[in-house]
Regions:
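Aromatic/acidic polysaccharide-binding cleft in carbohydrate-active enzymes
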Residues: 1-83, 89-92
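Conserved, mostly hydrophobic/aromatic
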Residues: 21, 49, 96, 124, ...
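Active-site proximal loops enriched in glycine and acidic residues that flank catalytic Cys/His/Asp
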Residues: 22-25, 37, 64-65, 98-102, ...
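Carbohydrate-binding surface patches
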Residues: 78-118, 124, 169
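Beta-strand-rich interaction surfaces with strong enrichment in secreted/lumenal proteins
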Residues: 98, 158-161
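Solvent-exposed, conformationally flexible loop/turn segments
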Residues: 104, 156-157, 165-166
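Acidic, Ser/Thr/Pro-rich beta/coil linker or hinge segments at domain junctions
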Residues: 117-159
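Short Pro-Gly-centered flexible turn/kink motifs
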Residues: 162-173
């Protein structure tokens, strides 16, 4: 789910150039929704797709992110925090998608949102599991599902939160 979340964040960040993208995972081997003769269940990758589809509408904001980095074997330095902000003018809503890619540490995040001072915190959705290889199955279809976090605080246009280690996050502010 973290890889899919980061991929979607990258697509959204480049929405000025990427006008269409295709999802190859529409067959049952690695589909977001799996089926069998007796039922259907959502894979963990379903949730970032759903969140991006529902809340990733509007204008992608040009944000400046200062984040710790790690050294990748192939591409040099890579950020631990992957994020994008979307302003949905039609619904007066700001959505922040964020992935904490750290395997070991939660991440404190602060955002200057004074331009959106009239907004209030609507919700902070988190998808994570202590076992990074955890999956949903037909026998246990809700093993990894989104939960709500109360770690996010919004005060005087400043947002402070903690993103759990290896987590997908959706933070929504509305008027």
């Amino acid at each position: 789910a973290l890889l899919v979340g980061s991929m979607l964040i990258t697509l959204l960040r480049h929405a000025d150039r990427v006008k269409i993208a295709c999802l190859a995972q529409l067959v049952n081997v690695i589909a977001p929704i799996m089926t069998s003769d007796t039922g259907a269940w959502r894979q963990t990758i379903f949730y970032p797709y759903m969140h991006a589809s529902v809340y990733g509408r509007g204008t992608v904001l040009n944000t400046q992110v200062l984040t710790p980095v790690y050294e990748s074997k192939t591409y040099g330095e890579a950020p631990y925090l992957d994020s994008v902000c979307i302003w949905d003018e039609e619904n007066d809503a700001l959505t922040i998608f964020a992935v904490n890619k750290s395997l070991d540490e939660d991440m404190e995040v602060s955002c200057d949102l004074r331009q959106f001072e009239r907004c209030r915190l609507a919700e902070h959705i988190v998808l994570t599991n202590d076992d990074m290889k955890a999956v949903n199955t037909e026998a246990d279809p809700n093993h990894v599902t989104p939960t709500h976090s109360d770690a996010t605080k919004l005060e005087n246009g400043k947002m402070h939160t903690v993103l759990g280690k290896h987590s997908w996050n959706v933070i929504r502010l509305t008027k």
